[in-house]
């Protein structure tokens, strides 16, 4: 069902006044952590994009700031008690934290290609991983291919990977979605975060329909 070498830079006093707490360039993107009032956000900055990837409300840490994140939780209407969850894309770690807090005995694997994002999530957003809430520094396609070989299945798969511009191209192909389908359990649910305003939206919708049939949009 669908529903590196790291180069860190010092933060100047001027940037501190603008609320920038951390800035570094990883192998994949430029990462900024900035704070406005009680809102702590991670931002990936590229030539064509300068949008927040993850935000945490320091006055209410368990509140999901973004509407899409709150909507993602509606996956539990279709599978109320998932035992294993796969999340592609870590950001500040708000989604794995939310599912972990809500579900007893759940095991969550979060795959993040950029080790710098993992480091920032732990240092600034206080994300913690353990045996039941793992974070794996790996390309999602490689991880899923290995999961197929090991016959690993997930009751809920969430595709939430962004590179600061849009979804990485190799995670938008029919071939990738067919691989994702193979790691879904019999009653498994797939949730994908896409932009309705993207010029690729119709292409994405057609690709998902080719693989999964009808879906909720």
Name what the model sees in each region.
Residues 35, 63-191, 195, 199-201, ...:
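The AdoMet/dcAdoMet-binding core of the Class I SAM-like
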Residues 39-54:
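A short, structured beta-strand/loop element
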Residues 202-217:
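Conserved Class I S-adenosyl-L-methionine
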């Amino acid at each position: 069902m669908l529903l590196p070498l790291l180069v860190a830079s010092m933060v100047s006093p001027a940037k501190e006044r603008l609320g920038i707490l951390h800035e570094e360039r990883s192998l994949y993107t430029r990462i900024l952590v900035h704070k406005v009032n009680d809102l702590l956000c991670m931002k990936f900055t590229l030539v064509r994009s300068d949008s927040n990837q993850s935000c945490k409300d320091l006055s209410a840490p368990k509140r999901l700031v973004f509407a899409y994140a709150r909507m993602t939780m509606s996956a539990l209407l279709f599978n109320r008690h998932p035992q294993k969850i796969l999340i592609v894309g870590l950001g500040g770690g708000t989604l794995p934290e939310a599912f972990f807090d809500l579900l007893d005995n759940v095991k969550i694997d979060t795959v993040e290609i950029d080790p710098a994002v993992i480091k920032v999530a732990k240092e600034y957003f206080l994300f913690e991983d353990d045996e039941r809430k793992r974070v794996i520094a790996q390309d999602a396609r490689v991880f899923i291919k290995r999961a197929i070989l090991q016959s690993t299945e997930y009751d809920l798969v969430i595709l939430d990977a962004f590179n600061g511009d849009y979804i990485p191209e190799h995670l938008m192909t029919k071939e990738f979605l067919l691989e994702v389908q193979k790691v879904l359990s019999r009653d498994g649910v797939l949730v994908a975060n896409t932009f309705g305003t993207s010029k690729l939206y119709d292409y994405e919708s057609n690709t998902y329909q080719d693989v999964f049939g009808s879906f909720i949009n």
